[in-house]
UniProtKB/Swiss-Prot annotation:
<feature type="compositionally biased region" description="Polar residues">
    <location>
        <begin position="210"/>
        <end position="240"/>
    </location>
</feature>
<dbReference type="Pfam" id="PF00096">
    <property type="entry name" value="zf-C2H2"/>
</dbReference>
<dbReference type="GO" id="GO:0045893">
    <property type="term" value="P:positive regulation of DNA-templated transcription"/>
</dbReference>
<dbReference type="InterPro" id="IPR013087">
    <property type="entry name" value="Znf_C2H2_type"/>
</dbReference>
<dbReference type="GO" id="GO:0005634">
    <property type="term" value="C:nucleus"/>
</dbReference>
<feature type="cross-link" description="Glycyl lysine isopeptide (Lys-Gly) (interchain with G-Cter in SUMO2)">
    <location>
        <position position="26"/>
    </location>
</feature>
<feature type="region of interest" description="Disordered">
    <location>
        <begin position="1"/>
        <end position="74"/>
    </location>
</feature>
<keyword id="KW-0805">Transcription regulation</keyword>
<keyword id="KW-1017">Isopeptide bond</keyword>
<dbReference type="GO" id="GO:0000978">
    <property type="term" value="F:RNA polymerase II cis-regulatory region sequence-specific DNA binding"/>
</dbReference>
<comment type="similarity">
    <text>Belongs to the krueppel C2H2-type zinc-finger protein family.</text>
</comment>
<keyword id="KW-0744">Spermatogenesis</keyword>
<feature type="region of interest" description="3 X 39 AA approximate tandem repeats">
    <location>
        <begin position="18"/>
        <end position="134"/>
    </location>
</feature>
<keyword id="KW-0863">Zinc-finger</keyword>
<keyword id="KW-0862">Zinc</keyword>
<keyword id="KW-0804">Transcription</keyword>
<dbReference type="GO" id="GO:0003677">
    <property type="term" value="F:DNA binding"/>
</dbReference>
Amino acid sequence: MTKVVGMATVLGPRPPQESMGPSPIKVEEDEEKDKCCPTLELSHKHFRQSGNQDTLEPMGPSTIKAEEDESKDKCRPNLEISRKSFKQFGYQDTLEQLGPSTIKAEEDDEKDKGHPSPEISRQRFRQFGYHDTPGPREALSQLRVLCCEWLQPEIHTKEQILELLVLEQFLTILPRELQTWVQQHCPESAEEAVTLLEDLEQELDEPGLQVSSPPNEQKQSWEKMSTSGTAMESLSSTETQHVDASPKYEFWGPLYIQETGEEEVFTQDPRKRQGFKSNPQKEDSADEHRSSEEESHADGLKRTVIPMIPANKYGSRSERQWANNLERERGTKASLQDTGSRKGAEPASTRPAPGEKRYICAECGKAFSNSSNLTKHRRTHTGEKPYVCTKCGKAFSHSSNLTLHYRTHLVDRPYDCKCGKAFGQSSDLLKHQRMHTEEAPYQCKDCGKAFSGKGSLIRHYRIHTGEKPYQCNECGKSFSQHAGLSSHQRLHTGEKPYKCKECGKAFNHSSNFNKHHRIHTGEKPYWCSHCGKTFCSKSNLSKHQRVHTGEGEVQ
């Protein structure tokens, strides 16, 4: 690069300009006396005293080269001649002689100061406001400048610019917390952003994962975020010294966040966060005063990888909110990993395919696709009815049946019978009417007896087979129906859950309670199809029907 020491030879005699006063070269030399190195000033003084300002031969090429090399790093911003200076002082014709290196000096100096990162340039372009400019034309011009600073069309190809736009749109459609997390890693392409997200999913899905990178790498990552335009600062020296004390570190559970008004602030020392495994002798005494609520929460969480986030390192509240949501989400996944570890530990090759029935009943051999259906099916063998109606005490083996039954207590009963009884469902009315008409579509093949319901036929068929699957644990007595076992067990416990609200009388079976309750209501649901007479119990109806059949007298 050509310096001022060689300017006299290149420029030649200055054009006559009487009004300009002192020589511009002299002015520049005087201004540079205090700024530039003393070696260069001595060389200028030597030339003026010798009177040989038109030649540089007395110094020799080696001396000139030495001065140029010596002053290259010290005086470069002050000695380079700009294009504006040549035009002002009449040396425009010598620009071609100086070459492109001197002319481009100012541009090189601007580059040395450092260009903003692509993310900062993008944010400047996107966040530029109309109120920042005096008018629309200035706003448009400024937008063009900011767009060029971001996309850099002078160095990027069309494909690279397209990739930048695709990357920006891809980050826009991501959830807020994932968007901020990916931006912190400064991906250069959409493919790199996808790779980062896939790696994050694997980390969250792998139980018991440990951090293997040393703390100094963590520090470098934070410093990289700071220089790349994120609103974060590098780790403080105090935090770095604490972290560097141990070669490896682990994290248990999520980061705990302290709420201060509306703002959420992370605990300042990462080693003080709940569950961080460190040397007990170096723990701060404040750790002993952690609330029992935090400790109980941390004990129930599975070990997981959580990035160390310094306190107050977020530049906006939205980023702090992102951190809160991200840690909360990770903590939720970690808490579920323990319950799902049995399934998660199972190899993918042994997992059931869709529609495959791997759950088999040990009693009858029936297969099911999931364990919940098998559990429901087993209740048909055990007779278990864990779902009890709080209104009438009726028990059911499935929650769905209880839900349907409970509606009869809450909603209207639009389906009425001639006997005055009402039902919430038409199917219940049909079953009830079979009692009046004595319709019995379900017939036993062994004895020919017919029943109005399929369940009644199944219970009756056990008389022929002698099956009594329901056994009392107290006395060992067996029953063919679960209702019989339930009634029998109340003899041991003395329980009488069915109590009449009218007179206070209690019963150990719902059928006895229903018969008694009809005394107060006057309900007579059983009526004779021959004469239309009604009765409050089925036994009374049977006795009456003997008159019509000739088997007995009317009671």
